[in-house]
Amino acid sequence: MLDNQSRITLWQTEPAALLYAQMLQGCLREYAGLEVPFTRGKPRAGDAVLTVDTALPQNRYTLSIMPECITLKAGSDEALCNGVQTLCQYIEQHGAVLPALEIEDWPDLANRGYYHDCSRGRVPKLDYLKQVADILCRYKINQWQLYIEHTYLFRDLSEAWREDTPLTAQEIMELDDYCAVRHIELVPSLSTFGHMYRILSTKTCCDLCELPDSEKIPFSYTYAGNHHTLNVSNPDALGFVKGLIDEYRPLFRSSKFNICDDETFDLGKGRSKALAEEQSERSLYLSHVKALCEYLVAQGVTPQFWGDIMWRFPESCAELPKETICLNWGYLPHQRENEIRDIAASGITQYA
């Protein structure tokens, strides 16, 4: 049983473990009514001990709750963070009097992701995003993507974001740092093909839109989602989105980048119609996706893209760089496996 003589003791841990001690301290304060200081050094009876044991596999931790002490051993700093989340959950359920317990735990899935739409509706503030990061850490989520169309403050695209409160470079970098110490990889995600309404409806960029004069049609969420695909027959289109990537990617320490490229409903139906009739819609789509993937791979970055369009011709996945990851999504409560099965048969790596 913990009491006011107890300590949260860090033993043979990385400096980052101070944060986990603070997490545990806050949990004990809120749910057990105890103000338990933390320290470093050799633990005593009655302490809650957080320690790294390199004899354990890196992703594994053991939690032992006995009358004389609480001991959390982990194979790595990340596993220690995960173990603290489990201990906090147990304290939330039982308060200061904790039933005896032995746990050995590790993740079955190496990549545990969460996707957050920051483009439709109100743009979240940094303080709120940090709260989300805390929740994701509690649930041991280790990858997080913010979906961005126009809601990042691109320096040359004020026409696109001036009616919103876009996230700034400083905010993204601060959030990236906040996530990193919680073992969450903040992965950049940026529309580079479909879903580019705000950007492609500006006077500066409307010539890059697949549909002529589409910038003159009043905004609606349905219209914006179904139209405003990049006109890949325009020789300036590829360079334009590469420029967006070049401005956005350096803000993140992640070695991944999601180019999205989903729901390109307009492709081959407007300005690129003649080229699509000559080459095929598949060729136009694949050429653009492949060019962006190769561009990222050349910089040591793992490209990701949404698989809804590629599923129409899954054999074409073999033409993409081998490092590419297909993100296979679905919203149904009982999601079918057709898309996952077909993409898997192509040999490409995928997230489901």
In which residue ranges do the predicted regions lie?
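Extracellular/periplasmic catalytic domains that process cell-envelope and extracellular macromolecules
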Residues: 64, 107, 251, 318-320, ...
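Substrate-binding cleft/loops of secretory-pathway carbohydrate-active enzymes
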Residues: 303-342
